[in-house]
């Protein structure tokens, strides 16, 4: 079991409280979490997500979309799977792992920004015969009554692109 340092625990609790406040807001809120390189940001976010899931009122489910640059989505998924290994509170998945074309409650969908932003290989938002694309998956998840939290890892690199803004709009 991974033990958080005192500053990590404090930051994770703070982040969880900010996200809870944002979820209660009638506006689409943005929560930014910054910490120095090597401080354990992924670990702190993992703990905050675990706290969100544990403290949700009955009947109010959460699903998550985690988007990263380069191959960081794979690294993040592996870290989170190890972190959640003992209690299995959250499930980590790639697009092709999704069942029933939706993100399950307490499931984190890991995506690479490259898949969203690169022209002609955009499998996540291109319409196809199975209606198996990111927009449909997000809508199906919302139709289940779950709130979706978008986590943009390394957002300073990509969050401003047109496709990224489109994803943010679809989720909100």
Outline where the language-model segments fall:
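RecA-like P-loop NTPase motor core of helicase/translocase proteins
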Residues: 1-172
């Amino acid at each position: 079991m991974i033990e958080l340092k005192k500053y990590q625990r404090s930051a994770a609790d703070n982040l969880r409280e900010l996200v809870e406040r944002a979820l209660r807001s009638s506006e689409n809120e943005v929560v930014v979490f910054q910490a120095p390189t090597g401080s354990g940001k992924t670990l702190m976010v993992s703990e905050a997500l675990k706290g969100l899931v544990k403290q949700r009122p009955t009947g109010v489910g959460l699903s998550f979309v985690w988007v990263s640059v380069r191959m960081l989505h794979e690294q993040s998924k592996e870290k989170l799977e190890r972190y959640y290994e003992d209690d299995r509170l959250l499930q980590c998945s790639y697009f092709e792992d999704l069942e029933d074309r939706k993100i399950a409650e307490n499931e984190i969908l890991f995506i690479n920004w490259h898949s969203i932003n690169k022209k002609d290989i955009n499998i996540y938002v291109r319409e196809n015969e199975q209606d198996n694309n990111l927009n449909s998956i997000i809508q199906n998840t919302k139709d289940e009554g779950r709130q979706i939290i978008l986590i943009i890892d390394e957002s300073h690199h990509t969050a401003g692109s047109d496709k990224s803004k489109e994803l943010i709009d679809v989720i909100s």
